[in-house]
Amino acid sequence: MSEAKRLAAEKAIEYVEDGMIVGVGTGSTVAYFIDALARIQHRIKGAVSSSEQSTARLKQHGIEVIELNHSGNLSLYVDGADECDANKCLIKGGGAALTREKIIAEASERFICIIDPSKQVPVLGRFPLPVEVIPMARSLVARQIRDMTGGQPTWREGVVTDNGNQILDIHNLQITDPEKLERELNQLPGVVCVGLFARRRADVVIVGGEPPVVL
């Protein structure tokens, strides 16, 4: 699948225009995009990064990393996904960067999602849904999510997000109405961010292959 990821990332470079500040996500597919972006870094002003991991890779290539507070709205955000349905709704957060990813997606005019074919699903939920929570609320939120959804929350023990929070992964979901579930989970006290990208879903999905498929 690494070749499919690389091909999707290379295709996404076609959406980068001169003078842009590019929003950059997190994960193994995005790493290929950062490497490809390095080849045209003379054409862009810099990048807004969604994680310390991506920031390190961008700086390794000499790409200037700009704070979102200083960049204003972005024309383009490129990120991967853990799952993608036919409506371009996503599950994200396997890399625990979901909150910053959602912030940058919200600030961007166009959200390009790059995936390999294994990430395409008819119904979201086979991949456990990540939820970032305030540490003191972890057990409370887990109980409330279990009662609300029937899913099985597990604590991603040992993982601390870049924001200092913890992650619950919700197993055994079949998410037939992603927007509704995203809205309901966001209302629980202690929830920082839900790894459903349905209200702000991808505008374009690129599925890696020979040739890549643009949805």
UniProtKB/Swiss-Prot annotation:
Residues that span the membrane, as ranges: none
Which leading EC class covers this enzyme? isomerase
The protein's Enzyme Commission number: 5.3.1.6
Looking up SUPFAM superfamilies in the UniProt record yields: D-ribose-5-phosphate isomerase (RpiA), lid domain, NagB/RpiA/CoA transferase-like
> Where is it found, in Gene Ontology cellular component terms?
cytosol
Q: Which residues form the active site?
A: 101
- List the CDD domains hit by this protein, alphabetically: RPI_A
In which family does this protein belong, per the annotation?
A: Belongs to the ribose 5-phosphate isomerase family.
Checking NCBIfam families in the record gives:
PRK00702.1, rpiA
Record's protein name: Ribose-5-phosphate isomerase A
Q: What is the lineage of its organism?
A: Bacteria, Pseudomonadati, Pseudomonadota, Gammaproteobacteria, Lysobacterales
